[in-house]
Amino acid sequence: MIRIGHGFDVHAFGQDRPLMICGVEVPYHTGFIAHSDGDVALHALTDALLGAVALGDIGKLFPDTDMQYKNADSRKLLIEAYRQVRAQGYKVANVDVTIIAQAPKMRPYIDQMRQTIADDLQCDVMQVNVKATTTEKLGFTGRGEGIACEAVALLIKQ
């Protein structure tokens, strides 16, 4: 049996912290306003994985009202969510992440992002795709106010 999940997340810029995307620190003058580290891509991917096996979403599993997740490393959240996916009898066939950002440019970091996700999901890097696009200066991402991300996860029964 196969299962598919979709995730979406968005965070605004504005906090003095490192900008984390796909578990990689991307040099930029500001970070995200968020309860955790704000890694918009890993949050979308976590939602996709959880959604594929009907385990809700990142907010259900790691509520922002719980102080233990304050400034949490989103890689740890992803790894825990994937542990729960595996407990349901599924593993990743492939994942696809789309980062929607006017700035900063993601291209120099894509390979590292793919490898980081592959490491966290215990899969081959060829099962992980990460890409970035702009909104041609339209909307909040186009104005440089934040970043959005979509993710899709295809899971197969172990």
From Swiss-Prot:
Q: Quote the pathway field.
A: Isoprenoid biosynthesis; isopentenyl diphosphate biosynthesis via DXP pathway; isopentenyl diphosphate from 1-deoxy-D-xylulose 5-phosphate: step 4/6
Could you mention a single GO BP entry for this protein? Answer: isopentenyl diphosphate biosynthetic process, methylerythritol 4-phosphate pathway
Residues reported in the UniProt entry to bind 4-CDP-2-C-methyl-D-erythritol 2-phosphate: 9-11, 35-36, 57-59, 62-66, 133-136, 140, 143
Provide the catalytic activity annotation: 4-CDP-2-C-methyl-D-erythritol 2-phosphate = 2-C-methyl-D-erythritol 2,4-cyclic diphosphate + CMP
Cofactor binding note of this UniProt entry: Binds 1 divalent metal cation per subunit.
Q: What are the protein's GO molecular function terms?
A: 2-C-methyl-D-erythritol 2,4-cyclodiphosphate synthase activity; metal ion binding
Q: Which UniProt keywords apply?
A: Isoprene biosynthesis, Lyase, Metal-binding
Enumerate the residues binding a divalent metal cation.
Answer: 9, 11, 43
At the top level, the lineage of the source is Bacteria
- Establish whether keyword Lyase is in the entry: yes
Per UniProt, subunit arrangement is: Homotrimer.
The record's annotation in HAMAP family points to:
IspF
Q: What is this protein called?
A: 2-C-methyl-D-erythritol 2,4-cyclodiphosphate synthase
Native organism: Actinobacillus pleuropneumoniae serotype 7 (strain AP76)
User: What gene is this protein translated from?
Assistant: ispF
